[in-house]
Amino acid sequence: MAAVSLTVSTVKPLGDRIFIKVSASEEKTAGGILLPDSAKEKPQVGEVAQVGPGKLNDDGSRQTPEVSIGDKVLYSKYAGTDIKLGGDEYVLLSEKDILAVVG
């Protein structure tokens, strides 16, 4: 079996799945206190890196995703599957877990 090299461009989400690059979490508080990894909040904002073809409807047609590559989005805190690629954090989630497009 050949080894597969995973990069953002080789990840092709299926159905209504969206692949998001997670924004970096805050390293310190507003008062200047450095936060250890265990105290950092899980980020809920990221940039859309890849978009699936859309949800398949009962009649066989596809529902076009409402987000596009490059959109900044706010998503549910515990949604999706966390993935690490090339030192960056990503999350693969269903479009229904995206709450809003921001910025």
UniProtKB/Swiss-Prot annotation:
A GO BP annotation: chaperone cofactor-dependent protein refolding
Gene Ontology CC terms, in alphabetical order: cytoplasm
InterPro entries assigned to the protein according to its UniProt record, in alphabetical order: Chaperonin_GroES, Chaperonin_GroES_sf, Chaprnonin_Cpn10_CS, GroES-like_sf
Keywords from the named record: Chaperone, Cytoplasm
Major subcellular location class: cytoplasm
TM stretches of this protein: none
Gene Ontology molecular-function annotations: ATP binding; metal ion binding; protein folding chaperone; protein-folding chaperone binding; unfolded protein binding
Keyword Cytoplasm in record: yes
Pfam families on file: Cpn10 (PF00166)
Subcellular location: Cytoplasm
Regions annotated as coiled coil: none
Role noted for this protein: Together with the chaperonin GroEL, plays an essential role in assisting protein folding. The GroEL-GroES system forms a nano-cage that allows encapsulation of the non-native substrate proteins and provides a physical environment optimized to promote and accelerate protein folding. GroES binds to the apical surface of the GroEL ring, thereby capping the opening of the GroEL channel.
Family to which this protein belongs: Belongs to the GroES chaperonin family.
Assembly and interaction partners: Heptamer of 7 subunits arranged in a ring. Interacts with the chaperonin GroEL.
Name this protein carries in UniProt: Co-chaperonin GroES
The organism of origin for this protein: Prochlorococcus marinus (strain MIT 9312)
